């Protein structure tokens, strides 16, 4: 099993799909990494040679991924909260940040619906 950026990539998947298991690498970024490393997208993770793994690791090391990226995102959110911006307040209260309506929906962000006591006839 190939281990890149601290993540074990699934052996049976194509390398372009396997790279997307790393936080911060999507499909487009995975394709660019493989193009720069000179590795075919169709090769399976289990079929990678050690030389190809090293080339991919070198490319991934140039990108901010996993822990560093998670830390940066959390610091950005914390900064928004500290300066008291509208977006920071929405993060603090657990509401949608990007202008979505919340009258009926937004259950994912607001959590499970809580019944109001005394609402019966």
UniProtKB/Swiss-Prot annotation:
GO terms for molecular function: rRNA binding; structural constituent of ribosome; tRNA binding. Residues 90-121 are annotated as: Disordered. The keyword Mitochondrion does not apply. It comes from the Bacteria. The keyword Coiled coil does not apply. Keywords: Ribonucleoprotein, Ribosomal protein, RNA-binding, rRNA-binding, tRNA-binding. GO terms for biological process: translation. GO terms for cellular component: cytosol; small ribosomal subunit. NCBIfam families: uS13_bact (TIGR03631). HAMAP family: Ribosomal_uS13. Part of the 30S ribosomal subunit. Forms a loose heterodimer with protein S19. Forms two bridges to the 50S subunit in the 70S ribosome. Belongs to the universal ribosomal protein uS13 family. Located at the top of the head of the 30S subunit, it contacts several helices of the 16S rRNA. In the 70S ribosome it contacts the 23S rRNA (bridge B1a) and protein L5 of the 50S subunit (bridge B1b), connecting the 2 subunits; these bridges are implicated in subunit movement. Contacts the tRNAs in the A and P-sites. This is Small ribosomal subunit protein uS13. The lineage of its organism: Bacteria, Bacillati, Bacillota, Bacilli, Lactobacillales.
């Amino acid at each position: 099993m190939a281990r890149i950026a601290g993540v074990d990539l699934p052996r049976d998947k194509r390398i372009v799909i396997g790279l997307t298991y790393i936080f911060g690498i999507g499909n487009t970024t995975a394709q660019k990494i493989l193009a720069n490393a000179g590795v075919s997208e169709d090769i399976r993770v289990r079929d990678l040679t050690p030389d190809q793994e090293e080339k991919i690791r070198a490319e991934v090391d140039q990108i901010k991924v996993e822990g560093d990226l998670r830390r940066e995102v959390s610091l950005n959110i914390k900064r928004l909260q500290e300066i008291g911006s509208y977006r920071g307040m929405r993060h603090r209260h657990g509401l949608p940040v990007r202008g979505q309506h919340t009258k009926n929906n937004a259950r994912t962000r607001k959590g499970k619906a809580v019944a109001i006591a005394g609402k019966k006839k």
